[in-house]
Regions:
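Catalytic cores of nucleic-acid endonucleases
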Residues: 57-120
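Beta-rich nucleic-acid/ligand-interaction surfaces
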Residues: 32-52
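Conserved catalytic cores of phosphodiester-cleaving nucleases, focusing on short active-site segments
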Residues: 22, 46-59
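Phosphate-interacting basic helix/loop segments used at nucleotide- and nucleic-acid interfaces
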Residues: 13-16, 26-39
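Charge-rich, low-complexity intrinsically disordered segments
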Residues: 168-195
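C-terminal structured domain segments
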Residues: 117-177
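Single conserved hydrophobic/aromatic residue that forms the stacking wall/gate
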Residues: 3-8, 12
Length: 195
């Protein structure tokens, strides 16, 4: 089989599992899909309710190093609260492939024509094409997921905190060492006003 598209694999690893959990937690499907801005190069992966969620993923069993792609990504001056959602995946034979996860989401939103259309549009924007579904063979299971609220003590660089003259930054943080209130997705969605 051909190597899986890194863009589509990235969508799976970073965002689709969270999207499914949002809908399972009571966020209306269309609202959850409309908030999913990752495929559209949004500053955060989800802008929902009054705030946002940035999804980070690791396959590592130890530690949780997350790559932050800009000074804007963890800036909560525009949207509050802001959560970093850490998702730990494991590649296992009993896991779910990307096409299986997509099929499950399509089934979940099947009764809403607008939601089906929006899901298809976002998947294409993310680089997932159903015609290539046979190429996505890796199976993953979510072993842990947590939402960490970004507050004053959270380690981050923003335009407001970076030294004068710094206009761009890409950096790593260890989510296991980052201070902040840790909750599950449903609690975070409540705090965001999404459910």
């Amino acid at each position: 089989t051909r190597k899986e598209s890194s863009a589509a694999s990235d969508v799976y690893k970073r965002q689709l599992s969270v999207l499914a959990l949002m809908i399972e937690s009571g966020t209306p499907a269309f609202v959850a899909l409309e908030s999913w801005l990752g495929p559209l190069d949004g500053v955060q992966d989800f802008e929902i309710g009054t705030g946002a969620m940035e999804v980070k993923t690791t396959l590592s069993d130890v530690g949780f190093i997350a790559k932050i792609g800009s000074l804007e990504q963890l800036d909560d001056s525009v949207r509050k609260p802001l959560f970093v959602v850490g998702t730990r995946l494991k590649q296992v034979t009993a896991g779910t492939t990307l096409p299986e996860l997509v099929d499950s989401l399509r089934t979940t939103v099947a009764s809403e024509a607008d939601a089906i259309r929006l899901l298809s549009d976002r998947l294409i924007a993310a680089g997932y094409f159903p015609s290539q579904r046979d190429h996505y063979t890796r199976r993953f299971a979510v072993t842990d997921i947590k939402a960490i609220e970004v507050g004053a003590a959270f380690p981050r660089l923003t335009h407001g905190t970076a030294p004068l003259g710094v206009t761009r930054a890409i950096y790593d943080i260890d989510l296991e060492k980052a201070p902040g209130a840790v909750s599950d997705i449903k609690t975070a969605l409540n705090k965001l006003g999404a459910i």
